From Swiss-Prot:
PANTHER family for the chain: AMPLIFIED IN BREAST CANCER 2-RELATED, NONSENSE-MEDIATED MRNA DECAY FACTOR SMG8
Record-stated family: Belongs to the SMG8 family.
UniProt entry tagged with the keyword NAD: no
Protein's recorded name: Nonsense-mediated mRNA decay factor SMG8
Keywords attached to this entry: Nonsense-mediated mRNA decay
Biased composition (Low complexity): 573-583
Organism: Caenorhabditis briggsae
Protein role: Involved in nonsense-mediated decay (NMD) of mRNAs containing premature stop codons. Probable component of kinase complex containing smg-1 and recruited to stalled ribosomes.
Annotated stretches, region: Disordered: 541-596
GO BP terms: nuclear-transcribed mRNA catabolic process, nonsense-mediated decay
Coiled-coil residue windows: none
Top-rank taxon, per record: Eukaryota
Length: 871
């Protein structure tokens, strides 16, 4: 019968049992058309107490039954998910289905609250083969309700003569769970089936334990809703075939056994049957483990006192309910805002107990968290759209107001905490830093200026080619084409002669104020004077002790034939090749000391201040900030993008051995290309001048017969390409990589290949695919032009003309053709980035097609008569 009716009638019906110690058992489950949750309890009691199906008038109630034999009080819950309740909600005329279900769920929460504070055991029947997590979540809400109202419950229980739990309940109930179905095959033999039952029960027992702990339903203290037995298993699999019992057979077996022992009278007086059913034994073992502590009389008083839990008296008054509803709506909106914030910041959902207070502000620690990533404007809009779509989906009331708040808070958060710099590097990648003041920003102090960072690196070679360093992607043309090559670690380049290009210098500047330019050296005349100075100092070299590496070079040059023109390059460092002479050293000045003591930041700050100064003087149109172009004739650049340097004498290169101490060349690819140039001069005049040139040359240590039938000279040239990984290679006249096989005669092979085409007159690509095969593939760019000049009365000039796709005009040095001295090894370093009137060229990291062109004829050789005086 209903719990209220049972409480009213129990004192008169069970008058003789009022002092009996009992246990209170709560039953929770679902009714199905073919099986009710009370069926298994009927088997336990061996009588049909609980109906198979609940009527429509008995939904969302508690049925009570006291078993005098077992001394157990059963409280069976008819819940929301019973078929009768679902049918009742569907057929309700006064309320729609959802309103009726919401009311039923509220009533079920009261019923569960009542059971968990008044029972010793809670038996949960699960009709499926898995644990219902939705029901576990519902129990968590019940536990929250119990915690909120425990003081009120404790006050009501003060008048009951029993030592109740201080938390406002009889005790912390033990939970048992029985599964009505399982996935074990019916055709399995009995022994195997029993073994599978035991394994499955054990696994489900562990799962239930973990789930209850996860939802904070078990544990120590007053926060636990229930507890689990530490020594006994709490999960049982019901075997439908063994639920039904043959009561007559059981009684007959008992009477026969006792009759044989002569105790028939005792059997008649105490005819309690022992159970041979697995589920019944399961319940009996668990119930016996706990002592009966409360009498039936006190239990009735307790249940009567707790009826206010069932009738809703615990709930707040309508006025409080209205305020709670408003608070609930605000909390829901706050949760929606929190979820929108999580979608915007791409955070993971917080675990239980860690939910944010509803705000959108990001703390400083969170900005340091890699998961809270700064983002560009495009990424900001994508994340913002995800957040607004979520709000539009879940919010019905005040949607426009909530959307406006989300938009404002997302924009504020992006502007203050998440906005990326988005400045584009010279290679086309954005800066990954949070928006920051950079060099030249006049709105902030100089100390706050910081450099950009694209979080990408590449490998580049110094001007002379002897050393490579890893560099960050440049964000300015000066950083790309100039600053990196002034790195203090490039010691190999410091002692070499370097041509000083003409640079812009306003009238108010002094020579030493410009870090990278000496005005007196910015002309071809200065280069010729330097060459004459080299000739004068070379006389002193004959009387000085040369390094072993140079002595080998001179010896090898004497032993080599003129036809082969084998000029050897030294394996020693540039300092060794120049020891005892300052022929190629740049003149020491206050500028050199200044450069060596300044960092990259100091140079960037200095340049930014110089630009600011010129901007104030309104001279921004007087100079060139890019690479010299035919469209910008008449303007001098602020910094050089080309470098012309001399490694030393031409006999530093030996064609049979190739380049040495030049990193990252492929094996067989370190050889220059011989180029024979025929001269337009009378043969007799040529022979006369050549003899005079060699006779007057103080560096000549021997003479050889001239056997040429026509005037000609041989140069060694190399057009070097380099990719972002630092791979380097030369190309032939077709622009294909020049790599010689192993064990091949390079002298003969190179002559044969050179005869196939004139590399000096060939148009070569500015960019082409690199030889590296490791993905991702890279493109290599023409970076250096190597020229080894002959020892002959000729004038050699170099004047590169470069065409860039999509750019107007032709790029070059911006000066007259650069004259190269005889018997020298020169390297012309080309720009890394091309920027001009048409913009900056960003070709991308890889393109299978060739791009850009270096026009042929950049190196010219003409006859130069020998003058009576020394040249």
């Amino acid at each position: 019968m209903n719990i209220s009716e049972w409480i009213e009638q129990s004192r008169s019906v069970f008058k003789a049992q009022l002092d009996t110690k009992i246990k209170i058992i709560g039953i929770i489950g679902k009714d199905y058309p073919d099986h009710g949750k009370g069926d298994n309890i009927n088997c336990y009691l061996r009588e049909n107490v609980f109906p198979v199906a609940t009527s429509d008038n008995e939904t969302c109630t508690i049925f009570a039954h006291f078993s005098e034999d077992e001394q157990l009080l059963f409280l069976v819950l008819n819940g929301v998910d019973d078929v009768a309740n679902l049918r009742k909600c569907m057929e309700s005329e006064s309320k729609n289905y959802f309103e009726a279900m919401a009311e039923s769920e509220s009533q079920q929460m009261r019923l569960l609250h009542f059971l968990f504070i008044s029972c010793h055991f809670i038996v949960i029947f699960e009709q499926t083969s898995r644990i219902d997590l939705e029901f576990i979540r519902f129990l968590k809400k019940v536990n929250t309700l119990r915690s909120l109202n425990r003081r009120k419950v404790s006050q009501r229980l003060r008048d009951v003569d029993f030592d109740f739990d201080s938390d406002g309940r009889l005790t912390v109930p033990y939970v048992l769970m029985a599964f009505q179905r399982n996935n074990i095959r019916t055709d399995t033999n009995i022994t195997k089936k029993r073994e599978l039952y035991e394994k499955l029960e054990k696994n489900l027992d562990h799962q239930l334990t973990d789930i209850l702990k996860l939802y904070d339903l078990t544990g120590s203290g007053n926060s636990a809703l229930c507890q689990l037995s530490e020594s006994l298993q709490v999960v049982h699999l019901l075997n439908p075939d063994s639920v039904k019992r043959d009561i007559i057979t059981e009684m007959f077996d008992i009477f026969m056994a006792e009759a044989e022992n002569g105790n028939v009278a005792r059997v008649a007086a105490n005819h309690k049957l022992t159970s041979n059913n697995a589920f019944v034994r399961f319940l009996e073992d668990r119930f016996r483990a706990e002592k009966n502590e409360i009498s039936l009389n006190i239990a009735i008083d307790m249940l009567e006192a707790l009826q206010f839990v069932l009738d809703g008296s615990l709930e707040e008054k309508p006025e409080s309910l209205r305020s709670q509803t408003q608070t609930f709506i605000k909390r829901i909106q706050s949760d929606h805002m929190e979820e929108a914030r999580r979608l915007y910041t791409n955070e993971t959902r917080p675990v239980s107990g860690e939910r944010r207070g509803g705000g959108f502000r990001i703390t400083e620690q969170e900005t340091m968290d890699p998961s809270v990533k700064i983002r560009s404007k495009q990424e900001h809009l994508i994340r913002f759209n995800e957040a607004t779509c979520y709000i539009e989906t879940v919010v019905g009331i005040n949607q426009q107001e909530i959307l406006s708040q989300v938009q404002t808070q997302c924009n504020d958060m992006w502007q203050s905490d998440l906005r990326a710099c988005e400045s584009i590097s010279m290679m086309g990648h954005p800066c990954v830093k949070k928006v920051h003041p950079t060099y030249g920003d006049q709105t902030v102090p100089e100390a706050r200026w910081t450099a950009h960072d694209a979080s990408n690196t590449l490998v580049s070679t110094c001007v002379c080619g002897n050393k490579q360093l890893v560099r960050q992607e440049p964000f300015t043309l000066k950083e790309a084409n100039f600053d990196f090559y002034e790195h203090p670690d490039f010691n190999c380049c410091k002692g070499l002669w370097r041509y000083q290009f003409q640079l812009y210098q306003e009238d108010t500047e002094e020579k030493d104020d410009i870090m990278w330019a000496d005005r007196e050296s910015n002309s071809l005349r200065a280069a010729k004077k330097m060459a004459q100075r080299e000739d004068e100092l070379a006389v002193e070299l004959d009387d000085m002790e040369l390094p072993e590496s140079l002595q080998q070079s001179y010896t090898s040059s004497e032993d080599s034939s003129e036809d082969d023109d084998d000029f050897a390059i030294q394996t020693a460092s540039s300092e060794d090749s120049l020891s005892g002479s300052d022929s190629y050293a740049r003149p020491g000045s206050r500028r050199d000391e200044f450069e060596s003591s300044k960092t990259a930041r100091d140079m960037a700050v200095y340049f930014a201040k110089r630009i600011q100064k010129l901007e104030k003087l309104e001279k921004m149109d007087d100079f060139l900030m890019g690479v010299p172009n035919t469209l910008t004739i008449g303007k001098l650049p602020m910094f050089p993008s080309f470098f012309l340097t001399s490694l030393g004498e031409s006999n530093l290169y030996k064609h049979g051995a190739g380049l040495k101490n030049q990193p990252n060349f492929k094996l067989g690819g370190e050889y220059l290309t011989p180029a024979v140039v025929f001269l337009d001069v009378d043969l007799d005049v040529w022979c006369r001048d050549l003899v005079k040139f060699r006779t007057d040359d103080y560096t000549r240590r021997g003479t050889k017969d001239l056997k040429d039938d026509m005037p000609r000279v041989k140069l060694f040239v190399g057009f070097e390409y380099e990719c972002s990984r630092g791979h380097r290679f030369f190309v032939d006249h077709n622009g294909e990589p020049l790599i010689y096989p192993r064990n091949v005669n390079v002298l003969k092979e190179s002559s044969a290949r050179a005869s196939l085409g004139n590399i000096l007159n060939a148009d070569l690509p500015l960019r082409r695919p690199c030889t590296c095969r490791k993905p991702p593939l890279k493109s290599a760019q023409l970076q250096k032009i190597h020229v080894v000049t002959p020892k002959a009365p000729v004038k050699i000039t170099i004047d590169p003309k470069i065409l860039v796709p999509g750019h107007e005009g032709t790029y070059g040095t911006g000066q007259e053709p650069l004259e190269l001295h005889h018997s020298k090894y020169y390297i012309l370093h080309l720009p890394v980035v091309y920027s001009g009137p048409s913009g900056t060229w960003m070709p991308g990291e890889y393109n299978s097609e060739r791009m850009g062109t270096l026009k042929g004829g950049s190196i010219k050789v003409v006859y130069k008569p020998v003058m009576p005086f020394r040249w």
